[in-house]
Amino acid sequence: MASVEKLPMLAEGYEKLTAELKALREERPRIVDAIEEARAHGDLSENAEYHAAKERQGQVEATIADLEDRVSRAQIIDPTTLSGDKIIFGATVTLLDDDEKPVKYQIVGPYEADAKKGMISYNSPLGKALIGRKVDEEIEVTVPSGDKFYLVQKIEFI
């Protein structure tokens, strides 16, 4: 039997997933009602409301299945319980870029990543380059605009 790959995530990411799942499950009956109402309007071949409701139902069901899968595989990680001198999932890292300007990122799961909030996926090019690194190590990352160089300045588990 194949093992199920766990999805590491922070508690906040798990809460966001479960909230989205709950909202979609609550939307299900409204979609069924919309389909029934549209059906009552007669000819389904030219019934835009019916086709829109059926399309939305398909989208919602697919998203629910995806979210249920992710929730079932979730492995919640609390960064405050971690320690060490290497960058791992959940670590908050301060880097110095080419201009010696400090930038701070937290290593998170792919579904939690939000670069604007300083949260990068361990699967991203920068995330992959950081995992396993220590303070004072230099890393090189190839991004669409070219190669970027960083120096690991600090590793925290907060």
Curated annotation (Swiss-Prot):
SUPFAM superfamilies: FKBP-like, GreA transcript cleavage protein, N-terminal domain. GO terms for biological process: DNA-templated transcription elongation; regulation of DNA-templated transcription elongation. Belongs to the GreA/GreB family. This is Transcription elongation factor GreA. The gene is greA. Keywords: Coiled coil, DNA-binding, Transcription, Transcription regulation. Residues 5-75 form a coiled coil. GO terms for molecular function: DNA binding; RNA polymerase binding. HAMAP family: GreA_GreB. The keyword Ribosomal protein does not apply. It comes from Novosphingobium aromaticivorans (strain ATCC 700278 / DSM 12444 / CCUG 56034 / CIP 105152 / NBRC 16084 / F199). Necessary for efficient RNA polymerase transcription elongation past template-encoded arresting sites. The arresting sites in DNA have the property of trapping a certain fraction of elongating RNA polymerases that pass through, resulting in locked ternary complexes. Cleavage of the nascent transcript by cleavage factors such as GreA or GreB allows the resumption of elongation from the new 3'terminus. GreA releases sequences of 2 to 3 nucleotides.
